[in-house]
Amino acid sequence: TLDASGANGGGTVLVGGAYQGKGTVPNATRTFVSSDSVIHADALASGNGGKVVIWADDVTAFKGAITAKGGARSGNGGLVEVSGKQTLIFQGSADLSAPQGMLGNLLLDPQNLTIVAGTGYG
């Protein structure tokens, strides 16, 4: 579990790189987040949810859970990016809710995207 939650706003969690693989944070070639992994960047009382980025220049496989929720009294949901520049396997969940505000944003950003109906990957 990684927890960057705060009373007045969520923090930032970067795994494998920064937003869209840009900036000075070194990028991973491959990133794997297991099904028992949980990442929180919630505003606990007030404020906006934080930012969580899961990135890889080649392949990202994400099976965990992310929350970047807005505060219980005020605030909007945060921003979550789960991206593999070439390939993305997304089998996890992201909760960007906000009881008193607007939902946050989820960015899934591989080079190509295929959406398949079903109950699982494989």
Question: Which residue stretches match the model-derived regions?
Answer:
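Extracellular and secretory-pathway beta-repeat/beta-biased strand scaffolds
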Residues: 1-122
